[in-house]
């Protein structure tokens, strides 16, 4: 603001006169001498400062008087200078009457012990004592009042009219006292920013509050003499004269009223007080020497009182008598003001230096120095020093309140301490002080200081003054002050906008990359992914970005703005911009004017004054933020779209019902077209164009409820003209949907549903043909393919027959791919500019549009797991390059370690293996190192382009086996076969049903040794499985196809169990060393819970049934022998296998039993017809009381059972259905311990199958201790002294020798029913007798025993709880079991007899001890030598010493 004022004065032509007047005033002031001289000489000597800062100066409140002062100064500048006096010649010229402005950077701390340290008020007095004044930086807020002006004191003496609190304008003008004409009316204020006087009453003309009667004139001069403190004149504050009859006195009354009634200007240049109007040669530097003599310059802190909330930060004022203001931190100097604020002052005579009013002209609260206090002799130093001490204490206490400044920090240096005060010395009155004596009154308490404010550092302070209320809603967007935006002017020739407002850089028009990018920008129909100003006018880019934001699904535009898809030319150009544009101009956080590469510089929008152009910048800023998630960003985007809708669609804003009427008219147009249809043969191209138009409308409508109406016409009644009209109406309807109301959107949804149901027979109920006709996506998939197959796919896209030309008047078949109607040849497509297929402008919206139909269905069903046709039922875009994160090996390259069985794949299938991406579960395993494309040179694409042999075509068909469904699919082709009628499970999507693989391709894919021959037809029922086969080989494919080896012949399958394993649970895979282990989930059951239910045992984290403890694959041979097939949702051909079994057995009039345990049904899962038996249950690990209530010891072996969860109840339903369907077959036994065997680590070996039969146990254990004389080794090998059971399985030697190592204890099932299981909240809900029965029951391992199921009301009928009885000795009755770290001893209920040992009193459970660190409590065992143990189980046990080892 100071620079603007300086330029204004200089341009107005008054600055030369001011310099001349200041020089003349300086010479006359020196000639008058320090002793005073005549009154006229003092006035002439002070006119140089009064011209700027005096009561009638240019920066005072009296603008009219300022004009008179200018004229008087110009007239007096021609007088010859008066020679200096003798006294003045003796003093140095430098320290005589000098006023120095001290900048922030020139501050220094006072020396320790200096009296002036931290006392700006003291420094002020010293400066006035020696006849000079130094102005320091202003403070935040001042507490001192504003002293009266000389004119006010003169008016008080003369009794000027106007009543109390008012003064005459003429009396307040120093120009009028010297003969210059003064204003006779209310003074006008001059605004430097506007340049015209403002007709506003000055501070003297405003009403004041009534003041007390005037006091004697002798007291008015007391503050000027700065005498000792007295009760009437306290040293801590100034003395005021509240009733002076004229202008307010130096008290706080005038300052307070002036601050309350004065309206500040918005652009008031308070910073101009730091400017020096003298020539550079006439300025004197600042004296900061602390050891200078009495004639040296003394720095004085100068106060500026804050002017309201819009205070300028460069204001400067003179400290009043009330003490110095609080200190503030030095602020950083702005660019360009260092030379003007380097501590240079205004030279004048000693008397005029105090006489002139240096308070800011626009600071209403700034105190002014009274004339009587300024014009005093040098002998008043003793009295003023005491007053200065009082001011020093006040200023230091107030300075501590400022933030960021340490208490007591000095503002400026002061001279040496003054001499002791001389009370007898009286000040010599001057002419001015004698004539301006006024009455004095007791001084009021000083005003409290304002709280400190945080300093603003904005260089454009006028832009921060926001007006109240919203900006104008029409017209150009201007600043809050109604001005053009700063920095929006066009840059200089040869430069372009870059960086902050007004900044620029050199242009790069001559670069080849820039010229090519400009050509692509001119040819592009949408926004380009990288834009710089050299590419041309940014209006096209801004408008394209706005269209992009309002088109497509929510969030896609934001994603593209943040990370636009770039082709190779755009990527090279982006790298060029990073290297040549951004890198030379700063770091990553440097202000560039745009957030992302597609955005033009924001200065273009500011210059155009178009608020709509700010929308892409706001959306990009939100997209780049990391403080919001995707949903929150979508909300902000929708808010911006709604806020800018009136500007983006001005027609709708003018007429609120314009868009709604358009939607209604278009919907009526659709129905009218069907009503006026004429029969005729409809080309397939027109039907596909109608399908694409329907998709565009649905994309704008989603989410919107849809209904299925009846077709409007039969397919034979539709003609070409009808479809042309319907397609045109749909395309117009798509553009009219944004801004429509809910009712109109529902009407549009009904219309597009009517069109779809009517045209569906023409496209054979599939949209794949329409998607395949979008040749742009064929080119895009080819261009984004890997380098080794990109050329072949590009040639195939060029050879693909394109659609027919649309009829006249019909909209383009690909409305979102402008400029591409007929596929171009391969060379032209390879070098196509950005406006052609796959470029940045069309990528965001089109990617979402064309893949929206298949993304919701085929992606989850597994179609996305391959490349090309394997990822889509048609030739749609290939998502594999976007998701491919790991490198792939080259075609035909062999992975090390795959084994000889990899050779089972045909050569064609091997060549097509490496181009798809793998699922996460397929990439884990021991083989983790793979060859990649980067290890060798890429294959030459030229032979692929030139070759047209059948082998190349067959190779490509094997890589991309899926295509659209033909009119008559071959019976042995690969496609989904869903039975007609009702199904137990959801039907697959239309995209999954439309996928088709030709029979010869399907045979080539499935005829491999990896797949059993009898199960190969099941793979042809699943096109997704064929796509996976085309992209995989080796161990990953073999693991997923291992389910086929459970049952050799599909005819033998009776029951299919569907399950969804937990992560890292594998039924047919060996756990690899170092592979991640599954995590226990008490709320969700997986493979472990299912197998435990079949094995009639508990599944806890420490049991053998938990997959985390497996060291090998489990054995389910007993289940498979009964015709039970376990099929995982992750198995290869999961959906096709179920549908194949349903189809094959249904054709043989046999029903299949399907036991479904999957909680989250996969998308496009198998469809099970209602002809077969379907049982739906769930796996619930919390059904085990040990998991549900871990603290309940008495129910540790109990399991809650219901027909809705996997257990004996649901198994009974399956077994009953099996007995009814197969009456002559052996009954099912689904809950038996021998159904499943686990491979775990035991003392018999790291891979021990459990339960290990007793004979096998003895064969493994006894040879290791036969002949061994080390008793410790024998005890360790045989488990002597260990608990009989650990974690519910046989662990000790005697238990393993009887039931087998790892034989589990059987649980007790408690039947609760569906409702009872949900309502059971705690163990207290079960009867007490049931809990006691479960606590005492100990069911010994039995491979053939059926589950024991109890009901809460039938506990008494169950009899005594079952127990374990040792039959080899009468006193062996207790069983020791370890659970939860404690060893419990279980005794049967009737064990307390004659043979009972000491302490065996019949208690059911007794805790005898806690296992030690080695897991085995020490017992009183004597030395036992094992010589031989017979393995004959039928031998007589009596007298066998080896059975009595306990």
Swiss-Prot record:
It comes from Suid herpesvirus 1 (strain Kaplan) (SuHV-1). One of its GO terms (biological process) is positive regulation of DNA-templated transcription. Residues 883-892 have a biased composition (Basic residues). Keywords: DNA-binding, Early protein, Host nucleus, Phosphoprotein, Transcription, Transcription regulation. GO terms for molecular function: DNA binding. InterPro entries: Herpes_ICP4_C (IPR005205), Herpes_ICP4_N (IPR005206). Residues 262-277 have a biased composition (Basic and acidic residues). This is Major viral transcription factor ICP4 homolog.
């Amino acid at each position: 603001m100071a620079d603007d004022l300086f330029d204004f004065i200089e341009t107005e032509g008054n600055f030369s006169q001011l310099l001349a007047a200041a020089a003349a005033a300086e010479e006359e002031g020196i000639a008058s001498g320090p002793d005073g001289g005549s009154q006229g000489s003092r006035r002439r000597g002070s006119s140089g400062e009064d011209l700027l800062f005096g009561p009638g100066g240019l920066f005072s409140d009296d603008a009219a008087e300022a004009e008179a002062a200018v004229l008087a100064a110009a007239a007096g500048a021609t007088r010859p200078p008066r020679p200096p006096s003798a006294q003045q010649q003796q003093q140095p010229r430098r320290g005589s009457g000098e006023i120095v402005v001290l900048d922030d950077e020139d501050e220094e701390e006072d020396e320790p012990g200096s009296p002036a340290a931290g006392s700006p008020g003291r420094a002020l007095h010293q400066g006035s004592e020696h006849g000079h004044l130094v102005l320091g930086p202003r403070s935040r807020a001042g507490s001192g009042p504003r002293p009266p002006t000389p004119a006010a004191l003169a008016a008080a003496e003369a009794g000027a009219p106007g009543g109390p609190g008012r003064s005459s304008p003429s009396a307040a003008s120093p120009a009028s006292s010297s003969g210059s004409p003064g204003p006779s009316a209310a003074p006008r204020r001059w605004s430097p920013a506007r340049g015209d006087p403002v007709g506003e009453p000055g501070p003297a003309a405003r009403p004041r509050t009534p003041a007390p009667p005037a006091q004697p004139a002798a007291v008015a001069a007391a503050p000027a003499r700065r005498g000792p403190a007295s009760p009437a004149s306290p040293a801590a504050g100034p003395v005021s004269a509240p009733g002076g009859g004229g202008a307010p006195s130096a008290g706080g009354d005038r300052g307070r009223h002036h601050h309350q009634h004065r309206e500040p200007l918005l652009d008031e240049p308070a910073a101009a007080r730091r400017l020096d109007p003298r020539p550079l040669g006439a300025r004197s530097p600042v004296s900061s020497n602390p050891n200078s003599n009495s004639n040296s310059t003394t720095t004085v802190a100068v106060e500026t009182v804050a002017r309201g909330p819009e205070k300028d930060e460069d204001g400067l004022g003179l400290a009043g008598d009330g003490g110095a203001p609080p200190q503030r931190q030095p602020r950083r100097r702005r660019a360009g003001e260092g030379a003007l604020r380097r501590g240079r002052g205004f030279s004048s005579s000693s008397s005029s230096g105090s006489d002139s009013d240096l308070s800011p002209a626009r600071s209403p609260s700034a105190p002014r120095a009274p004339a009587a206090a300024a014009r005093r002799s040098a002998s008043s130093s003793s009295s003023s020093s005491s007053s200065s001490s009082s001011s020093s204490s006040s200023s230091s206490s107030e300075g501590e309140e400022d933030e960021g400044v340490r208490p007591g920090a000095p503002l400026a240096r002061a001279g040496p301490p003054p001499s002791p005060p001389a009370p007898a010395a009286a000040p010599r009155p001057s002419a001015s002080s004698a004539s301006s004596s006024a009455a004095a009154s007791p001084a009021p308490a000083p005003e409290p200081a304002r709280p400190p404010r945080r300093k603003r550092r904005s260089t454009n302070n006028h832009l921060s003054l926001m007006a109240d209320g919203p900006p104008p809603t029409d017209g150009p967007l201007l600043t809050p002050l109604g001005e053009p935006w700063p920095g929006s002017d066009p840059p200089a020739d040869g430069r372009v906008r870059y960086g902050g407002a007004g900044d620029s850089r050199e242009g790069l028009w001559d670069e080849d990359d820039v010229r090519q990018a400009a050509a692509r920008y001119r040819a592009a129909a949408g926004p380009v992914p990288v834009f710089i100003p050299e590419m041309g006018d940014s209006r096209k880019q801004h408008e394209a970005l706005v269209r992009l934001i309002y088109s497509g699904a929510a969030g896609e535009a934001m994603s593209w703005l943040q990370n636009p898809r770039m082709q190779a030319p755009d990527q090279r150009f982006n790298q060029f911009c990073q290297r040549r544009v951004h890198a030379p101009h700063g770091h990553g956080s440097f202000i560039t004017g745009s957030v992302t590469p597609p955005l033009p510089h924001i200065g273009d929008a500011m210059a155009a004054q178009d608020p709509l152009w700010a929308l892409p910048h706001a959306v990009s800023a939100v997209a780049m933020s990391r403080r919001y998630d995707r949903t929150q960003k979508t909300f902000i985007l929708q808010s911006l779209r709604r806020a800018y809708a009136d500007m983006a669609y001005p027609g709708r804003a003018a007429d609120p019902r314009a868009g709604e009427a358009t939607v209604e008219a278009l919907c009526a147009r659709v129905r009218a077209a069907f009503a006026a249809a004429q029969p005729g043969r409809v080309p397939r191209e027109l039907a596909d164009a109608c399908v694409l138009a329907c998709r565009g409308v649905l994309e704008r409508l989603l989410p919107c409820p849809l209904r299925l109406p009846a077709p409007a016409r039969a397919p034979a009644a539709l003609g070409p003209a009808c479809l042309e009209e319907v397609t045109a109406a749909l395309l117009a309807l798509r553009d009219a949907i944004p801004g429509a109301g809910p009712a109109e959107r529902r009407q549009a949804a009904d219309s597009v549903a009517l069109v779809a149901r009517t045209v569906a027979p023409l496209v054979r109920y599939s949209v794949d043909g329409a998607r395949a006709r979008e040749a742009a996506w064929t080119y895009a998939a080819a261009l984004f393919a890997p380098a080794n197959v990109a050329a072949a796919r590009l040639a195939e896209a060029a050879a693909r027959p394109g659609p027919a030309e649309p009829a006249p008047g019909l909209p383009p078949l690909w409305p979102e791919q402008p400029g591409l109607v007929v596929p171009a040849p391969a060379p032209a497509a390879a070098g196509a500019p950005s406006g052609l297929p796959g470029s940045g402008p069309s990528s965001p919206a089109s990617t979402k549009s064309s893949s929206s139909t298949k993304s919701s269905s085929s992606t989850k069903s597994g179609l996305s797991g391959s490349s090309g046709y394997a990822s889509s039922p048609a030739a749609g875009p290939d998502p594999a390059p976007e998701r491919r994160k790991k490198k792939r090996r080259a075609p035909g390259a062999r992975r090390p370690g795959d084994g000889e069985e990899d050779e089972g794949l045909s050569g064609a299938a091997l060549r097509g293996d490496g181009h798809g991406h793998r699922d996460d579960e397929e990439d884990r395993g021991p083989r983790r190192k793979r060859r990649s494309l980067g290890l060798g040179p890429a294959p030459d694409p030229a032979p692929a382009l030139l070759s047209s042999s059948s082998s190349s075509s067959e190779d490509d068909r094997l890589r991309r086996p899926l295509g659209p469904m033909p009119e008559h699919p071959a019976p042995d082709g690969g496609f989904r076969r869903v039975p007609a009628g009702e199904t137990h499970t959801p039907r697959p999507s239309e995209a999954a049903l439309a996928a088709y693989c030709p029979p010869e391709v399907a045979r080539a894919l499935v005829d491999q040794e990896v797949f059993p021959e009898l199960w190969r037809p099941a793979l042809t029922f699943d096109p997704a499985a064929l796509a996976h086969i085309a992209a995989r080989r080796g161990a990953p494919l073999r693991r997923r196809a291992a389910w086929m080896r459970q049952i050799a012949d599909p005819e033998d399958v009776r029951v299919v169990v569907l399950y969804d394993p937990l992560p890292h649970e594998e039924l047919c895979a060996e756990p690899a060393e170092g592979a991640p282990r599954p995590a226990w989930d008490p709320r969700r059951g997986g493979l472990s819970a299912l197998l435990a239910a079949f094995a009639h045992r508990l599944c806890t984290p420490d049991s053998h049934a938990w997959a985390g403890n497996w060291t090998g694959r489990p054995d389910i041979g007993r289940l498979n022998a009964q015709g039970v097939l376990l099929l995982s949702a992750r198995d290869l051909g999961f959906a096709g296998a179920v549908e194949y079994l349903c189809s094959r057995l249904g054709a043989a009039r046999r029903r299949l039993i399907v036991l479904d345990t999957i909680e989250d049904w996969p998308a496009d899962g198998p469809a099970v017809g209602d002809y077969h038996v379907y049982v739906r249950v769930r796996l619930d690990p919390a059904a085990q009381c040990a998991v549900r209530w871990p603290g309940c010891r008495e129910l540790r072996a109990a399991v809650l059972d219901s027909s809705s969860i996997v257990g004996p109840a649901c198994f009974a339903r399956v077994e009953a259905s099996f007995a009814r369907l197969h009456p002559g077959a052996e009954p099912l036994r689904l809950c038996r311990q021998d159904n499943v065997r686990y491979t775990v680590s035991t003392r018999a070996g790291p891979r021990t199958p459990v339960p290990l039969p007793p004979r096998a146990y003895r064969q493994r254990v006894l040879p290791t201790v036969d002949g061994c004389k080390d008793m410790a080794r024998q005890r360790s090998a045989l488990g002597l002294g260990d608990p009989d059971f650990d974690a519910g399985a046989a662990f000790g030697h005697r238990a393993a020798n009887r039931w087998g190592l790892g034989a589990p204890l059987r649980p007790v099932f408690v039947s609760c029913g569906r409702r009872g299981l949900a309502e059971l909240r705690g163990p207290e809900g079960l009867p007490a007798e049931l809990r006691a029965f479960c606590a005492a029951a100990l069911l010994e391992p039995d491979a053939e025993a059926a589950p024991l199921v109890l009901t809460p009301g039938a506990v008494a009928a169950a009899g005594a709880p079952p127990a374990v009885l040792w039959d080899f000795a009468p006193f062996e009755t207790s069983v020791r079991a370890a659970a939860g770290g404690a060893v419990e001893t279980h005794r049967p209920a009737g064990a307390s007899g004659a043979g009972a040992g000491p302490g065996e009193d019949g208690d059911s459970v007794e805790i005898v001890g806690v296992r030690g660190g080695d897991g085995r409590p020490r017992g009183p065992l004597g030395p036992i030598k094992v010589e031989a143990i017979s393995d004959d189980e039928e031998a007589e046990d009596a007298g066998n010493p080896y059975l009595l080892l306990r």
